[in-house]
Amino acid sequence: MKFVLVLVSLALLVSLASVQGNNYCGRHLSETLAYMCPELEGASKRSGAMGAAAMYGTRGWRWAAMGGNRGKRGVVEECCYQSCTLDELLTYC
């Protein structure tokens, strides 16, 4: 019974954290994006034989910097200067 109560409490905390939103800045922002977007792993590494097309796709670095189709607001404006939810942060993957 206690296990179920702890499990429900943990699920509630996780859901509240994703709804409430947090500020993600600097290293915390980059580490969170790296954790949430494993397909982007290695894109920020300077070593290796990756070309620009492999790192940023065929649309180039400007498209990646803008967050794809997110418009003019970038991930820093959205999640550092203001709070954002984990769902909003996932849109930058």
Curated annotation (Swiss-Prot):
Which InterPro entries does the record cross-reference, listed alphabetically?
Answer: Bombyxin, Insulin-like, Insulin-like_sf, Insulin_CS, Insulin_family
UniProt cross-references to Pfam families, sorted A to Z: Insulin
Stored Gene3D superfamilies? Insulin-like (1.10.100.10)
Prodomain residues: 47-71
Q: Where in the cell is it found?
A: Secreted
Q: Does the keyword GTP-binding apply?
A: no
| Cellular component annotations (GO), alphabetically ordered | extracellular space
- The signal peptide stretch is 1-21
Sorted keywords for this record are: Cleavage on pair of basic residues, Disulfide bond, Hormone, Secreted, Signal
In this entry, which stretches build a coiled coil?
A: none
Principal place of residence: secreted
Disulphide bridges: C25-C80, C37-C93, C79-C84
Tissue distribution is:
Located in 4 pairs of medial neurosecretory cells in the brain.
Q: What does the record give under GO molecular function?
A: growth factor activity; prothoracicotrophic hormone activity
Q: What is said about its interaction partners and assembly? A: Heterodimer of a B chain and an A chain linked by two disulfide bonds.
Q: What family is this?
A: Belongs to the insulin family.
Which PANTHER family does the record cross-reference, listed alphabetically? INSULIN-LIKE GROWTH FACTOR II
Please report the name of this protein according to its UniProt entry: Bombyxin-related peptide B
Per the UniProt record, the source organism is Agrius convolvuli
